[in-house]
Every structure is written in C-alpha cells, then in structure tokens.
Amino acid sequence: MSSPQDRAQQYIGQLDKELSKYPTLNNLEKTTGVPKAYAVIGLVALYFFLIIFNLGGQLLTNLAGFVLPGYYSLNALFTASKQDDTQWLTYWVVFSLFTVIESLISVVYWFPFYFTFKFVFLLWLSLPTFKGAETIFRSFLAPTLGRYFQNGSTASGLRAKADAVHTD
C-alpha cells in the first residue's frame, strides 16, 4: 500500500503531465524554475484563500462563475447537440438568480463564508463532472415551472426562434 505522500506525488505528476500541454505554463516553469504543477496549485490555493477571507470574494466568485461556464455555453451554441443546452440555460438562470438576490439583500452580512459556499455551489452547478444545473432543472424547475412552458422544451423553442430570425 502506498503512503499518502506517494499518492500526492502521483497526482502531482498527473497534473504536471496535463499542464505540459500549455506552452505558457512550460515557459513559466523555465523562466521561474518553479514546477508548473506547484505554481498552479499555489495560484488555486491563493484564489480559495482570497474567497474564504472575502478579499474580493464577490468579484472572484462571479469571475469563476462566468469564465468556465461562459466558455462551455459558447461551445454549446456552436454544437448541433441539444443535450448541453439544458445544462447551460439552467446554469445561467440560477447564476442570475444568485446575482439578483445578492444585490437586493445583504446576504453577505447574514451568512458567514457566503462567497465560499457560493463558489463551491457554482462549481457544482457548472463542472461537467457534476452537472448540477441539470440536476436542479430535472428535480426542481421542470416539475414546478414546466406546466407554464407546455410548448416543448424551452431550449429547443429558443433555438427554433433564433434560427427563424437568422434565416429571415
């Protein structure tokens, strides 16, 4: 049985191999002498630290909630598949709801570590491994609000309207 230190080194090796695909990180490693895996782990740890202690927590959380989902949403727009549309449309509805609630009430003062929990929740919603937005759609939005949208799925209806405008 391998020790925790051996397993950690194995994971760092896998991360280093994955990060080797990015020339910028390879150049950073050559320039600074710091292994790219350690640099990325350090930056991620700093990012979490800043969010946990609310040093720019709102900005960093919203940035994380926008960049990766924005990339995947744009990718979904350019694919013919409709499977990913539900995930990303639901994500943006939930993300927008959080943003509106934050602006209406000072939830930050009532709930300690709010931005930490929001950050973890947004990761759960957006990461393809978890597909949390799809889970929320299937378990909450579809059963409660589905009766108001009887003309098929909202994603396919929106796509059909966009295609109709584009062809005119």
Swiss-Prot record:
Domain commentary: The short lumenal loops between transmembrane domains 1 and 2 and between transmembrane domains 3 and 4 may impart a wedge-like configuration, thus deforming membranes.
Keywords: Endoplasmic reticulum, Golgi apparatus, Membrane, Transmembrane, Transmembrane helix
GO cellular component: cell division site; cortical endoplasmic reticulum; endoplasmic reticulum membrane; Golgi membrane; nuclear envelope
Organism: Neurospora crassa (strain ATCC 24698 / 74-OR23-1A / CBS 708.71 / DSM 1257 / FGSC 987)
GO terms for MF: membrane bending activity
Family that this chain belongs to: Belongs to the DP1 family.
Gene name, Swiss-Prot/TrEMBL: yop-1
Residues that span the membrane, as ranges: 36-55, 57-76, 87-103, 106-124
Name of this protein: Protein yop-1
Disulfide bonds: none
UniProt cross-references to InterPro entries, sorted A to Z: TB2_DP1_HVA22
Subunit structure: Oligomer.
A biological process from GO: vacuole organization
Cytoplasmic face of the membrane: 1-35, 77-86, 125-168
Membrane side Lumenal: residue ranges: 56, 104-105
Function: Required to generate and maintain the structure of the tubular endoplasmic reticulum network and the vacuole. Induces high curvature in membranes and causes membrane tubule formation. Involved in membrane/vesicle trafficking.
Coarse class of the protein's main subcellular location: endoplasmic reticulum
One Pfam family this sequence matches: TB2_DP1_HVA22
Subcellular localization(s) per the UniProt record: Endoplasmic reticulum membrane; Golgi apparatus membrane
Its membrane topology: Multi-pass membrane protein
